[in-house]
Each structure stands twice: as C-alpha cells, then as structure tokens.
Amino acid sequence: MKRQKRDQTERAFVKGYQAGIEGRSKSLCPHESGLARQQWLNGWRESRMDQWDGYSRLAQVQKITNLHPMSMSG
C-alpha cells in the first residue's frame, strides 16, 4: 500500500505541541520563517495553554493523538 506523505504544516504543529509538552522554549523553533514556523508556534502555544488549563501530560499526549492519529508514530 502506498503511504501518503504528511502535510508539512500539520507536522510542524504536532512537533510544536510536543515541544510545549516537554517544556521547551518557543525560541527553539527549528523553522526560520513562513507557515511552518507559524504552525509550530501555534502548536507550542496550544500545548502551553492546555497545561495552564490543567491538562496532565498524559491528557495532552492523548489529545494530540486524537487530533492527528499518525503524528505520534514516528
């Protein structure tokens, strides 16, 4: 079966969310500019807001897995 390539902006969002879960600084964004950087920062911000709203680390992992089912597999 042919694998479908993931959308780069979706991947950037997920990676940003994961960075937020791990408590990393937003200044560590690997993207210099453009839509990928914006999506990475959006993911990072959403993760931080979820932490402030009381989500546990496990709940955050579950949330991102539900939003993007293939994101945590690699």
Swiss-Prot record:
Coiled coil: none annotated. GO terms for biological process: regulation of translation. Keywords: Cytoplasm, Translation regulation. The keyword Nucleotidyltransferase does not apply. It is found in: Cytoplasm. The keyword Translocase does not apply. Its main location: cytoplasm. GO terms for cellular component: cytoplasm. Pfam families: RMF. InterPro entries: Ribosome_modulation_factor, RMF_sf. During stationary phase, converts 70S ribosomes to an inactive dimeric form (100S ribosomes). Belongs to the ribosome modulation factor family. HAMAP family: RMF. This is Ribosome modulation factor. It comes from Cellvibrio japonicus (strain Ueda107).
